[in-house]
Amino acid sequence: MAIKDVQTYIDRHGLVETTDSEVDKPIWRRPGFNGIRSLLEMEEELSRFLRERRDALNLNREQVGMMVGLHQEIYARHERAGAKLRVARLLHLAELLDFSPVEAVYAAAPHLFGDSREEAEVKMKLIMRMLDLPSSTAQHLLMMIEELSPDSPLDNPPKRSKA
């Protein structure tokens, strides 16, 4: 059943009404560390992240485009924020360029990881360390964390403070 009063939801989650050049109507967003990053700025950060990953692997656009099934010029649009990056394409690129989708989300929206830049950086480092853990170590860490915080995050979504 839908929430009867969406304004209560908006207030509880610290959302603010804003405009964005990508959307014709007002939208609600959660402010980041320096206000609200536009949707285009987030696309540009995703693009920069993809380009840096590709460069770090010494691949060119033609090679990545071929692996994705796109002409190099079409793929290049993703690296210039000229084409919207669908989630499925991002996941495919994560497979090809050997990154976690979490890294891409962090590049575009670090404010989703903490209330300050420092907190977000710490949490991102922790996430990346956890992703590299052997399975048995991850299981032990999970058991330890569950002892510290017995409620499952799926049962009780985290309450984010208003930015």
What residues fall within each predicted segment?
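N-terminal flexible/basic segments that precede or flank functional cores
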Residues: 1-44, 137, 141, 161-163
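Short alpha-helical DNA-recognition segment
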Residues: 55-77
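Short, basic-rich loop-to-helix N-cap that marks the start of a DNA-contacting helix
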Residues: 58, 81-95
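Short C-terminal boundary/hinge segments that cap the last helix of small helical domains
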Residues: 98-115
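Interfacial/linker helices and their anchor residues that mediate assembly or domain coupling
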Residues: 112-163
